[in-house]
Amino acid sequence: MKVINGLRQQGVPAALFAALLFGAGTPLAKWLLDSVSPWLLAGLLYLGSGVGLTIYRLISRAEPCRLARTEMLWFIGAIISGGVIAPVLLMFGLTHAPASGASLLLNAEGVFTALLAWFAFKENFDRRIALGMVAIVAGAILLSWPGEAEFSDVWASLAILGACLAWGIENNL
């Protein structure tokens, strides 16, 4: 009963849909990279997000939000890290890595986000967070153990992990 009530909350279906789109994004991007440059695809993905959110804000008649001047540098850092560096690194990594391996490596974003929050921003860190990070890493290792996911190109893997780190920085800014 709690699960059904949880699904009725406004943000839960949106979060599930976002997770679905994120999960489908890597194989779709890998497929598109056969005919589009990594730079162009990275730009188009984020342009599409911006256009979609702009349309949503116009339709919902959302109040404009004002950013304090003191927050502007943090905002610019988040845009550069998560909106420029991360997608470009991901697309370049995907050009030389299989989608299955990239999908497993993308789990590192949550780990990087938590570690940066803990070390750089002095956020609380407890046993549950540590266990969650261990579960993420262990799950990626277990899923790749039979040799199904290939990590043959070290530079591609490092580019994807760099994208995860950049998104972790964005999440914390």
Predicted regions and their residues:
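Glycine-/small-residue-enriched transmembrane alpha-helix faces in small-molecule transporters
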Residues: M1-L45, S49, A149-L173
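Helix-coil boundary and interhelical linker segments in multi-pass alpha-helical membrane proteins
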Residues: S35, F92-P98, W145-S152
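Specific alpha-helical transmembrane segments that line the substrate/conduction pathway
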Residues: L40-V51, L90-N124, A163
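C-terminal ends of transmembrane helices
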Residues: L53-P64, F112-F125, I169-L173
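Cytoplasmic-side transmembrane-helix entry/capping segments in multi-pass membrane proteins
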Residues: G11-L16, A68-A78, F125-V137, A156-S157
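Specific transmembrane alpha-helical segments of multi-pass solute transporters/efflux pumps
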Residues: L21-T26, T54, S60-S100, L105-L106, ...
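Hydrophobic transmembrane alpha-helices of multi-pass small-molecule transport proteins
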Residues: L53, L116, F125-P146, C164-W167
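Residue-level recognition of pore/gate-forming positions within transmembrane alpha-helices
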Residues: A19, Y46-G50, G110-V111, M133-I136, ...
